[in-house]
Amino acid sequence: MRSKLLFQQKMAALLALLLVLFCTLVRAQTVLSSSLHSEKKYKARMVKRPIKVDGKLKEHDWKQAVLISDFEDIEGASKPKPAFSTNVKMMWDSQYLYIGAVLEEPHLWGTLKKYDDIIYRDHDFEVFIDPMGDGEQYFEIEINVLGTIMDLFMNKPYKKGGTFDLGWNTTGILSKVIANGTINDNSDIDSGWTVEIAIPFKAISRTQRAATPSLLNPWRINFSRVQWTLEPDGKSYRKKLNQNNKPIAEHNWVWNPTGVIDMHLPTKWGYLYFKN
């Protein structure tokens, strides 16, 4: 009788422990899921007046636009918060999607000057757009502090066997970068840089029809900022090397985390709603 009672007590204790472990795992999974799949949303206002793409973002419409300021590490909230702020706004009219970004940056640095250079080898700002919102075909635009652009089209994500088309160009794109400091000069501390981009709707389409905004159906969109660890190099900068004599891995700071170091997961991007 006594041995049976002891057995029952041990089983009860074991079940209680398993219940605690289960609840802990569920809670952790919930937190992780909410941090990685928050599906952030943005409502872009339609503007009636022409916007001058000058990099200043001084128009009244820009001041009225909703601010994105909650960039995170691409892997999610479990990683350290970005060291520098990144603020983004969006607007639209009948022809363009306007994107304005202000990037805090104490060391303005850029080396790539040729169109379609691999811009993420510098500090950069990146835009990913899926106009259909289906997680398939999408477009990528990157720009550095020198105003150099790289753009490409993906027929589908890499994990689905997709390939990139670097020959695709964002025909008619308007862009301007303003450096608030001195580029490639380590003798001072800079404030940052401002990016203003106008993306023609007719450019981000693989058909004769423009990617027309819908007030009902959102697009998928995400923003990324690639940030390298630098060290002085004469009067300029260079990437700091690790113990294996290779550049220290870059930081990837994004609007909507994908959970892994991979931006090419459009189903994990945020939503862009067009507001009239």
Specify the residue positions occupied by each region the protein language model found.
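Bacterial Sec-dependent N-terminal signal peptides
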Residues: M1-S34
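Structural preference for beta-rich elements and adjacent junctions enriched in aromatics
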Residues: Q29-N276
